[in-house]
Amino acid sequence: MRVVIALGANLGNPRAQLEEAIEKLREVIVIEVISSFYETKPFKVSEDQPNYINAVLIGETKLEAEQLMKELLDIEERLGRKRSTVNAARSIDLDIIDFQGMVINSKNLTLPHPRAYERGFVLQPWLEIDPEAQLTGFGAVKELLAALI
């Protein structure tokens, strides 16, 4: 199954955190392409936070979507992610953005990612590695990104 995963971090050494997360992701997916790393300002936060480093990767997995989500949460925990408030600073954040174009609305997972369409820090790196990318239910990634600018 083709999967698009967004990565982000703004605590500790964010670039190193992303690189370590990518290595751990190789345990559960075959990574085909990884975007450049992008430095972005925190999105929709009330407190002062450091800038984020963000990236997107595309890969293949044999796992089902919910099992892959469990693996991502486990990787986050192993890399020191502490969950507190929404949009809090974080050592690592891993999100499934798209999973083979599936639409899933379960207790533990919503696909496609419900806020990806409004997040330039997801759309820009995704467009870099897949210029024809489509976000199921929302349209072409290049058009979604253009609408944000």
Where are the language model's segments positioned?
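N-terminal beta1-alpha1 ligand-phosphate binding loop
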Residues: M1-V28, S35-K41
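A SAM-dependent methyltransferase catalytic signature shared across enzymes that methylate proteins
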Residues: V28-I31, D98
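Short, solvent-exposed beta-strand edge segments and adjacent coil->beta transition regions
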Residues: R2, Y52-N54
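Flexible, gly/pro- and Lys/Arg-enriched active-site loops
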Residues: G12, S35, F43-Y52, L63-K70, ...
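Extracellular and analogous surface-interaction loops
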Residues: E60
